[in-house]
């Protein structure tokens, strides 16, 4: 699969990113390079290799799984440009 100028233009439009026409070829090349690396990774034989999250084995401290709201709603909403009834108010994002 190869990424074309039209693919870059479409992704930019869907993600609402302004991409100048003169950069479309450059970005298509970069994305094709990334996809090439992914193809190389897919060729690696990982049969029998245990999944890991770190090269150093560590133990994370355990704590009780307790549901809490944090009791800091006012502090959190203080950072919001706008809130109503204890919730963030954001602009409509779906057309």
Swiss-Prot record:
Q: Return the SUPFAM superfamilies for the record.
A: Glu-tRNAGln amidotransferase C subunit
Molecular function (GO) terms for this protein are: asparaginyl-tRNA synthase (glutamine-hydrolyzing) activity; ATP binding; glutaminyl-tRNA synthase (glutamine-hydrolyzing) activity
Which keywords belong to this entry?
Answer: ATP-binding, Ligase, Nucleotide-binding, Protein biosynthesis
Q: What is the superkingdom listed in this entry's lineage?
A: Bacteria
Report which reactions are catalysed by this protein. Answer: L-glutamyl-tRNA(Gln) + L-glutamine + ATP + H2O = L-glutaminyl-tRNA(Gln) + L-glutamate + ADP + phosphate + H(+); L-aspartyl-tRNA(Asn) + L-glutamine + ATP + H2O = L-asparaginyl-tRNA(Asn) + L-glutamate + ADP + phosphate + 2 H(+)
Q: Name one GO biological process term.
A: regulation of translational fidelity
Principal EC category: ligase
A Pfam family of the record is: GatC
Q: Does the keyword Cytoplasm apply?
A: no
Listed EC numbers: 6.3.5.-
Q: Which residues cross the membrane?
A: none
Q: Which family does it belong to?
A: Belongs to the GatC family.
Oligomer and partners: Heterotrimer of A, B and C subunits.
Q: What is this protein called?
A: Aspartyl/glutamyl-tRNA(Asn/Gln) amidotransferase subunit C
């Amino acid at each position: 699969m190869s990424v074309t100028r039209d693919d870059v233009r479409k992704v930019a439009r869907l993600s609402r990113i302004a991409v100048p026409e003169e950069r479309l070829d450059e970005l298509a090349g970069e994305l094709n390079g990334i996809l090439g690396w992914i193809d190389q990774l897919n060729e690696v034989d990982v049969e029998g290799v245990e999944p890991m999250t770190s090269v150093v084995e560590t133990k994370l401290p355990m704590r009780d799984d307790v549901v809490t709201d944090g009791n800091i709603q006012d502090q959190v909403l203080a950072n919001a440009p706008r809130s109503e009834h204890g919730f963030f108010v954001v602009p409509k994002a779906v057309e």
